[in-house]
Regions:
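N-terminal leader/capping segments at the start of a protein or of a new domain
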Residues: 1-56
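Ligand-binding loop in jelly-roll beta-barrel domains
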Residues: 65-66, 74, 128, 135, ...
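A short beta-strand-loop-beta hairpin characteristic of the jelly-roll/cupin
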Residues: 106-139
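Residue-level marker of beta-strand positions
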Residues: 142-143
Length: 174
C-alpha cells in the first residue's frame, strides 16, 4: 500500500510530504490494521515533517481527533471454538488499547462499541456487519456510517476482506 501525504514548503508551495507505506501496522496475523493518518484536534501545520500516523495504534481517536485507516479481515477457519475466538478477539482489542470497548460479546467475539462516528467503505470481499439486533451483508463499495453502536465485522469469503475507515470521536446520545 502506498500513502501520499501533501503539505507546503516554507514558501507556501504545495509539496509531497510523505510517499510510501503506512508508518504503523498491527495484527497482520489476523488481518491487519494500517494507520494512514491521524489528527488530534489541534491546528494543522502543513509545513511540519511529522508523520501523524507514526504513533502507537489505538482504536479510538483522541478528543477532537480523527483516525484514517485501512483494515483487513481474514476469513475465520472452520471449526474454531467460541472460547478460542473470544481469546483471540480479546487479545487483538487489548493490543490496540480497546479491551474496554468489548461491552457485550455474546453475539460475536469481536463485538465492540466506541464513542465514534465511523465512515467505512468495503473495498473488497464479502462481509457481514453484525449489530445487537440486526445483520447486513456488504458487497464492495457499500458504505457504512457506524454511529457508536455495538458491532462486529465477519468475513464470509475465502480471501481477506479489505476496508477503509475514518473514525471521528463524538458524543453519542441514545
Amino acid at each position: 500500500m502506498r500513502r501520499i501525504i501533501t503539505g507546503h514548503n516554507n514558501k507556501g508551495e504545495s509539496i509531497i510530504s510523505f510517499d510510501g507505506p503506512p508508518a504503523r501496522s498491527i495484527g497482520e496475523d489476523v488481518g491487519g490494521l494500517f494507520e494512514l493518518w491521524n489528527t488530534d484536534g489541534d491546528d494543522v501545520i502543513s509545513t511540519d515533517e511529522i508523520d501523524r500516523a507514526d504513533e502507537d495504534i489505538i482504536l479510538s481517536p483522541p478528543n477532537g481527533g480523527t483516525k484514517f485507516r485501512y483494515f483487513q479481515i481474514n476469513p475465520i477457519p472452520d471449526g474454531v471454538p467460541d472460547d478460542v475466538m473470544q481469546e483471540i478477539a480479546a487479545d487483538a482489542f487489548e493490543k490496540i488499547g480497546a479491551g474496554h470497548h468489548r461491552v457485550d460479546t455474546r453475539k460475536h467475539p469481536a463485538m465492540h462499541k466506541t464513542e465514534t462516528i465511523d465512515y467505512i467503505i468495503l473495498l473488497k470481499g464479502d462481509v457481514t456487519l453484525i449489530l445487537d439486533n440486526d445483520e447486513v451483508n456488504l458487497k464492495p463499495f457499500d458504505v457504512v456510517v457506524q454511529r457508536g453502536t455495538n458491532h462486529a465485522w465477519v468475513n464470509n469469503g475465502d480471501e481477506p476482506a479489505l476496508l477503509i475507515a475514518v473514525l471521528i470521536l463524538s458524543l453519542i446520545h441514545i
